[in-house]
Regions:
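Glycine- and charge-enriched loop/helix tracts that form the active or gating conduit
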Residues: 1-62, 69-87, 91-109, 198, ...
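A residue-level signal for conserved active-site and pocket-lining positions in enzyme catalytic cores
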Residues: 9-10, 47, 92, 118, ...
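Charged substrate- and nucleic-acid-binding regions of tRNA-handling and nucleotidyl-transfer enzymes
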Residues: 98-99, 161-255
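Histidine/acidic-rich helix-loop-helix segments that form or flank divalent-metal centers
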Residues: 29-38, 48-49, 105-168
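Short hydrophobic/aromatic-rich motifs at helix boundaries and adjacent loops
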Residues: 16-21, 33, 67-69, 122, ...
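Hydrophobic alpha-helix feature that most strongly marks membrane-spanning transmembrane helices
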Residues: 52, 56, 65, 70, ...
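Feature representing long, continuous alpha-helical segments
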Residues: 64-67, 90, 94, 98, ...
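Glycine-rich, flexible loop/turn motifs
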Residues: 19-25, 81, 136, 186-189, ...
Length: 255
């Protein structure tokens, strides 16, 4: 129930920096011009304990351990706002395969799940604004797919503060996000969203070789569905890419 205990022992014994140097690097607080950041090592252990109260899923625990792993490498100081860690979620996701390989963990769908959760862990809380569009919710649901519940669980576990009033405010904001996601999901059934037209089908119909154009057309369809410009149907998607391709000067040799 408190896996942080073992990591604390490794930290105190000096073994952590040998076994898991990336996690060790999260330790410490830097102060500049009166502005500091939290100790991301102890924050990570708190997130790990939080998620362990909600689930015994090993891979969600690994997502908790790795969610901020790239913060030391992305740390910058801005005189106006203080310390920033822009892009730590993307860099952290890039690190997941190499960390898994070194730890002799499986490089399969479990690794891909952890990678996805690390990459997306900031996204739900960014949807707090009252003016957030349904399209923004759809985009998150599309990217998270079946793992949307796991992602929300990780984000909730990521709420740590010694100030209980602040925690309650964050939890209230997070509940607002969950309600928005539920509302859009019940209306659009996007949890298992699949693009109605595959890259292979685009190449078959237009006699194209694998290329950047194929990926761009497929992305156009996804964005059009998310923005509610077209229904999630094959015929609508096909007509849309024909029209968009023509407007952008892409010439197809149709079979």
């Amino acid at each position: 129930e408190k896996p942080s205990y073992g990591f604390n022992l490794l930290f105190q014994s000096g073994l952590l920096k040998i076994i898991f140097p990336e996690l060790q690097k999260l330790h410490g607080v830097q102060i500049r011009e009166g502005k500091s950041h939290k100790d991301n090592f102890f924050h990570t252990l708190q997130v790990l304990d939080n998620i362990s109260k909600a689930t015994d899923d090993l891979w969600l625990r690994w997502a908790a351990i790795l969610h901020d792993i790239a913060k030391p490498d992305t740390k910058r100081f801005n005189k106006k706002v203080g310390w920033t860690f822009h892009g730590h979620e993307d860099k952290g996701a890039q690190w997941v395969p190499s960390i898994f390989k070194r730890m002799k963990l499986p490089l399969n769908e479990h690794m891909k799940l952890v990678q996805k959760l690390v990459r997306l862990h900031l996204r739900p809380i960014a949807l707090i604004s009252k003016n957030v569009t349904d399209a923004a919710i759809r985009r998150l649901m599309y990217e998270a797919g079946d793992e949307i519940d796991d992602l929300l669980m990780l984000c909730k576990a990521d709420i740590t503060s010694k100030n209980n009033n602040r925690v309650q405010q964050y939890l209230m904001n997070f509940k607002h996000v969950e309600d928005k996601i539920q509302k859009v999901e019940s209306k659009d059934s996007l949890r298992n969203f699949k693009n109605p037209i595959t890259g292979e089908k685009i190449m078959e119909i237009f006699d194209l070789e694998p290329s950047r154009i194929v990926g761009e057309l497929k992305e156009m369809v996804k964005e059009a569905i998310i923005e509610n410009k077209i229904p999630n149907q094959y015929d609508a998607a096909l007509e849309y890419i024909k029209k968009e391709g023509k407007s952008q000067g892409i010439v197809f040799k149709q079979k």
